[in-house]
Amino acid sequence: MRAVHLLALGAGLAAASPALANESVLKGVANPAEQVLQTVDYANTRYSKLDQINASNVKNLQVAWTFSTGVLRGHEGSPLVVGNIMYVHTPFPNIVYALDLDQGAKIVWKYEPKQDPSVIPVMCCDTVNRGLAYADGAILLHQADTTLVSLDAKSGKVNWSVKNGDPSKGETNTATVLPVKDKVIVGISGGEFGVQCHVTAYDLKSGKKVWRGYSIGPDDQLIVDPEKTTSLGKPIGKDSSLKTWEGDQWKTGGGCTWGWFSYDPKLDLMYYGSGNPSTWNPKQRPGDNKWSMTIWARNPDTGMAKWVYQMTPHDEWDFDGINEMILTDQKFDGKDRPLLTHFDRNGFGYTLDRATGEVLVAEKFDPVVNWATKVDLDKGSKTYGRPLVVSKYSTEQNGEDVNSKGICPAALGTKDQQPAAFSPKTGLFYVPTNHVCMDYEPFRVTYTPGQPYVGATLSMYPAPGSHGGMGNFIAWDNLQGKIKWSNPEQFSAWGGALATAGDVVFYGTLEGFLKAVDSKTGKELYKFKTPSGIIGNVMTYEHKGKQHVAVLSGVGGWAGIGLAAGLTDPNAGLGAVGGYAALSSYTNLGGQLTVFSLPNN
């Protein structure tokens, strides 16, 4: 069996590295009865050591209790559990509930921010929020209007709040946050509004801004060292971003940071991805558009970037690079390596050395991916590290006002933000995917602050010549770059996965099923239809010696935007309304937490 180790899961790491991470987070991460981060641990593995529910008995799961959030539209993320309190969040208006598990989920406190509803039409792809984080006795929430709030975990009282962006300029938030040491790290949304996007660190106790690093712009705004920050093993050089944009286009260049963050306490580096360049019309922005579509490794104290890797230079398809970075220590080619595995929207599964940024593996995790033949990993090649684009599917080469047809994947990617999971018992990654292709027609657009800056019309449909569905749930070998097994889904698998020590992997489906599969074989062991489509992430916790599994249901997100927002034009929702029109025959709006456990006997 391959030697595989997890980061930030055990108490031993906390003891070994007391100065390199937040002690309260490490304590919570080391206790599988709780969940203090949306990602389960700093390494983003979404793996639980709980094994009371296992492959033999998961078929006996029953609904233990439910809770209505009182809010409709897309429910992403998951609850947190700290001690006997469960913390539940909602999409806009981002209500937070504290539920006492010792008292039948009694509401202990409720926080309901007063946000201007004008932020709703500025949010891309539904009014979702990917959840809370816990650190140092505080619940951290990044609201839709970009207000970052620290709440007292016991009372719900506001400790402090700070505004991270300006919705009138198109800046909003849908993401969770990452507490690291004495800081909290947050991103920003707005790539469809021409926002120059960034990552920001705030002081955990006061909310004071410590540093801000942009994805695009001059070196001082990027927080890079032209001689020490590297890409593919070489210094990036002076003005590495500016040289790849025409004139001042970088000022409206996007590269937003609305995905997930991970952190390696040993290397003292945080990892995340930057999103698409603005506009979606590639003809309007010549050049590689650095550093959009990029994996970043930064020091959390200073923001200084150690290395960057751009996955999709001069993006022509909206293949946002924001998906999670999963950190593992594994043997690669016989040597122990600190690895980073990333399943990108562009359809390639990447394995990198997270210390150096070296790309070790880049393979398609859906065989229908056709926009590029491969990623060139020949270090002697002029195109080293770049995808080799197929001309037929190049919206740049085909030109403005030309409909490029049959591009796979669609803009929402082979996987969007819905997070994968990793099991150290199998050494496999469990990935909820989209099996969707598109037609893409770019057109010229003018930038106006606070107005959509998209410049493309899309239509989406199931991948042709396949099983007819729009998704798969797969197991992936990140060392070989191969699919080990694949389960077809009727719609995109839009719920985040959870792997457990009980040899069970959980995930949710757009039509509302919670599913449990065998981690080794993929065999379906259990499913239950919840009241609405699942785009949330499955979580597990232990209360009074009993393991529970919980998931939020509430259809929405990009794939479910037609239902969530009541849209009927097939081209609306950037093409998703037509692509997922059949979803309305299987589910409807909702907002519910469903909690499962085994029978008492």
Curated annotation (Swiss-Prot):
EC number: 1.1.2.10
Entry annotated with the keyword Metal-binding: yes
Binding-site residues for pyrroloquinoline quinone, renumbered to this chain: 130, 174, 189-191, 258, 345, 494, 558
InterPro entries: PQQ_b-propeller_rpt, PQQ_MeOH/EtOH_DH, PQQ_rpt_dom, Quinoprotein_ADH-like_sf, Quinoprotein_DH_CS
Disulfide bridge partners, by residue number: 124-125, 197-256, 408-437
Cofactors demanded by this protein: La(3+); Nd(3+); pyrroloquinoline quinone
Compartment(s): Periplasm
Record-given protein name: Lanthanide-dependent methanol dehydrogenase
Organism listed in the record: Methylorubrum extorquens (strain ATCC 14718 / DSM 1338 / JCM 2805 / NCIMB 9133 / AM1) (Methylobacterium extorquens)
